[in-house]
Amino acid sequence: MILGIGTDLANIERVEKTLARFGDRFRNRVFTPLEQARAERRADVAGTYAKRWAAKEACSKALGTGLRMGIAWKDMSVANLVTGQPVMELTGWAAERLAAMTPPGHEAIVHVSLTDDHPWAQAFVVIEARPLAAPPA
């Protein structure tokens, strides 16, 4: 069952200007060290940060809170599987909120999709509750 859906659109040029103006202050407030390391290795640094910004916004919407009620930017982190597929990792209050909204007997799965077409970066997040497998009889 679907527990939440969120989407966000971020302007890559705006993120680029914010990075130029605030630098590490912005990076350290919003992005985890892993996200920063990945972004700084990419050819399109601003685009990478913009997609992750959009993913965090979309995730906060899927959690039903937006960026309030104690949720912090770094409670949501985008990583990538070896295949390149993005995955959302939740910690802190975001993880607590996810646990609270997951029905008993289910596990929560956070699906994330990222795309960009300059100057836009877009993210979709779907939170699914999947029934836990019953133990064999």
UniProtKB/Swiss-Prot annotation:
The gene is acpS. It holds the Pfam family ACPS. Belongs to the P-Pant transferase superfamily. AcpS family. It is found in: Cytoplasm. Coiled coil: none annotated. Transfers the 4'-phosphopantetheine moiety from coenzyme A to a Ser of acyl-carrier-protein. Keywords: Cytoplasm, Fatty acid biosynthesis, Fatty acid metabolism, Lipid biosynthesis, Lipid metabolism, Magnesium, Metal-binding, Transferase. Its EC number is 2.7.8.7. It comes from the Bacteria. Its main location: cytoplasm. This is Holo-[acyl-carrier-protein] synthase. It comes from Cereibacter sphaeroides (strain ATCC 17025 / ATH 2.4.3) (Rhodobacter sphaeroides).
